[in-house]
Amino acid sequence: PVRSPQWGYRRKARLGVKYVDKKGGVIMGFRERAKPYITDCHQCDVLDERVSALLDTLRGTFNQLSVAARIPQLEIAITDNRVAMVIRHLDSFSDSDLDGLQRLAQAAEFDFYLQSGGLDTVVPLTGNAQPLNYDIAGVTLKFEPFDFTQVNQVVNEKMVARAIELLAP
């Protein structure tokens, strides 16, 4: 069987974001299956620790945005050397909002992207967003933060290595 670490393995995630006044502001986490609820997460042990450790910081920053109630989701893509987050927003950010997001991106060393509509509207928050890529079986794969990639890189690497082994003459 192919196995991976139990914790910190998840390299791709889509978190729901919702402003709930009765809960004191923004909640963030995975959507409950077949329900309109979000499981409010302050940490997520299956996510890469670089992201899990900053969920409350993200929440705090989002709570201070003028459009906090208009952010429905956060798409996360993680590689060995980069973390990219696509912030889906339904209303435009103010200049103050953009400054706050830039400060967080610099402090966390993350790349933020903004998405106001479909995939064709995704733009980097700043002009210096680094490309995402990972190496597998000697091939470097480049991708965008919203592209499909395997959630569990360790399992993916093991499966590819096993497939190559089985296909060898």
Regions found by a protein language model. Name each.
Residues 1-169:
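Accessory RNA-recognition modules of RNA-modification enzymes
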